[in-house]
Design a protein with these regions (language model features):
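Small-residue-biased structural context
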Residues: 1-249
Length: 249
């Protein structure tokens, strides 16, 4: 990707791109990147599950379909909320001070359309079906959203840090934290690891330690219950036990 000059996106002389020094952690540690890492992780896990299913060279059975539908429903909720965050919160907020890259906004409808194709393919699965169509659509989806998220981190995130101080973002971050689905935070914790989340990310974001005990640990448990247990069952080829059966939501 060519060198990205944040000054090229300045909207007004009243808001110069001079805020980077106020950020006391590198861009790759930002929560925006954490969400992207989690979404990529979910996409990779489901791809592994689909590959394991295809390797068995037989049609799907009922419990496998339920596991696929449950895990994907969580991913769909996560990615839909994330795009809502960006389109309705972050982007309008950033446009107060920067010329937000047009391509990033134009990408979302295309990605969402492909995700809808995946959703339709999953919803119509019946016993005996193969995963041929789904795996093709899933790869197309992953190949679209992955580079898009990388581009956001290489452009929009740099603009955010150049034109805004961390405290400027507090109202936006608080809204997202309070209103986002449990799955989103649970996924971020899972792919970041509990240790890094508690010892580094919570400290970085000035989140009091007690919040782990009253909130975050339950979000992680929800993600594991609804996504990880279903994906692991698919990979192992073992129907979930009563205590960890698929939960359709």
């Amino acid at each position: 990707m060519p060198h990205f000059n944040v000054a090229d996106y300045q909207l007004s002389a009243d808001y110069p791109p001079d805020k980077e020094s106020f950020w006391n952690y590198p861009a790759e540690k930002d929560g925006w990147c954490a969400v992207h890492t989690a979404l990529k992780g979910e996409i990779a896990l489901l791809a592994e599950a689909f590959a394991a299913l295809k390797s068995r060279d037989r049609g799907l059975v009922d419990w496998e379909i339920k596991c696929i539908q449950t895990a994907f429903a969580c991913h769909f909720q996560h990615v839909s909320w994330h795009h809502h965050d960006e389109d309705d919160s972050f982007v309008p907020f950033m446009k107060q001070r920067v010329k937000y890259p047009d391509k990033l906004e134009a990408d979302h409808p295309k990605i969402e359309a492909q995700c809808q194709k995946v959703k339709q393919a999953i919803e119509k699965l019946t016993e005996g079906d193969s995963l041929d169509e789904l795996t093709v659509e899933w790869k197309k989806y992953g190949d679209m959203i992955g580079p898009h998220m990388d581009e956001e981190e290489a452009t929009a995130l740099l603009l955010l840090r150049a034109y805004f101080k961390p405290e400027d973002l507090k109202p936006v971050i608080e809204y997202i934290m309070q209103n986002g689905p449990k799955i989103e935070m649970g996924s971020c914790i899972y792919f970041m690891s509990v240790e890094i989340f508690r010892k580094e990310f919570m400290v970085q974001e000035k989140i009091p330690p007690f919040v782990w005990y009253i909130d975050f640990q339950f979000r992680l448990a929800e993600f594991k219950r609804r996504v990880i247990k279903n994906v692991e069952a698919l990979k192992l080829g073992e129907e979930p036990s009563e205590g960890s059966r698929c939960i359709i939501s």
